[in-house]
Curated annotation (Swiss-Prot):
Pfam families: Rad60-SLD_2
Protein name: Ubiquitin-like protein 3
Gene that encodes it: UBL3
Organism from which the protein derives: Homo sapiens
Expressing tissues: Ubiquitous.
Modified residue annotations for Cysteine methyl ester: 114
Length: 117
């Protein structure tokens, strides 16, 4: 499929946690939530074991980061006419940026200061 990608489209190769992959064509105007809904509505037969109950819990991961629902493929500056790899996971909520690290620092009470005598 990836060899015949239209020049105005983006081919996404989605990888599940199980390692199964499937390719889908999208417009640069499609958002992460549009993609999740499309994949849910067109769930591949060989992914049947990983079927989820709702498109709202499908999350895309690109370059190690969760994509929020309103982010478009065009905003990510993905190359047109080429294949881009993303991971697809089922997750109820997205983590807040740096929230866990901040909480850990507050709990320890550690201070990073320097005393000059």
């Amino acid at each position: 499929m990836s060899s015949n990608v239209p020049a105005d489209m983006i081919n996404l190769r989605l990888i599940l946690v199980s390692g199964k992959t499937k390719e889908f064509l999208f417009s640069p105007n499609d958002s992460a939530s549009d993609i999740a809904k499309h994949v849910y509505d067109n769930w591949p037969m060989d992914w049947e074991e990983e079927q989820v109950s709702s498109p709202n819990i499908l999350r895309l991961i690109y370059q190690g980061r969760f994509l929020h629902g309103n982010v478009t493929l065009g905003a990510l500056k993905l190359p047109f006419g080429k294949t881009t790899v993303m991971h697809l996971v089922a997750r109820e909520t997205l983590p807040e940026p740096n929230s866990q690290g901040q909480r850990n620092r507050e709990k320890t009470g550690e201070s990073n200061c320097c005393v000059i005598l």
